[in-house]
């Protein structure tokens, strides 16, 4: 099945501590999760590794979130939207369900 949300899509977070925020998808994982730039930050205790030049300490990094907790953002309506698929000129394209415009 084709992915409804892909890398570089702008999404709205629907659930969790960052609910209502908009961000860009930086990575889509095969487990049904994705990473949104700057959101779902967790603190990781990093052990120093002098061989790699990595300093130790507490760092913040983006953690994956379930794809069902985000919705694609429709620029035309300014709201979260659903995505459908259709064929145009022999190619499968994504479109917004609310106004039938193509995604990107």
Curated annotation (Swiss-Prot):
GO cellular component, alphabetical, reads: ribonucleoprotein complex; ribosome
GO MF term set: rRNA binding; structural constituent of ribosome
| Biological processes annotated in GO | translation
What keywords does the record list, in alphabetical order? Answer: Ribonucleoprotein, Ribosomal protein, RNA-binding, rRNA-binding
InterPro entries this protein is in? KOW, Rib_uL2_dom2, Ribosomal_uL24, Ribosomal_uL24_CS, Ribosomal_uL24_KOW, Translation_prot_SH3-like_sf
Q: Which PROSITE patterns match?
A: RIBOSOMAL_L24
Family annotation (SMART domains): KOW
S-S pairs: none
| Xref: Pfam families | KOW (PF00467), ribosomal_L24 (PF17136)
Function per UniProt: One of two assembly initiator proteins, it binds directly to the 5'-end of the 23S rRNA, where it nucleates assembly of the 50S subunit.
Q: Which family does it belong to?
A: Belongs to the universal ribosomal protein uL24 family.
Q: How does it assemble?
A: Part of the 50S ribosomal subunit.
What PANTHER family does the database record attribute to this sequence? Answer: MITOCHONDRIAL RIBOSOMAL PROTEIN L24
Tell me the protein's name. Answer: Large ribosomal subunit protein uL24
Organism the protein comes from: Shewanella frigidimarina (strain NCIMB 400)
- Gene for this protein? rplX
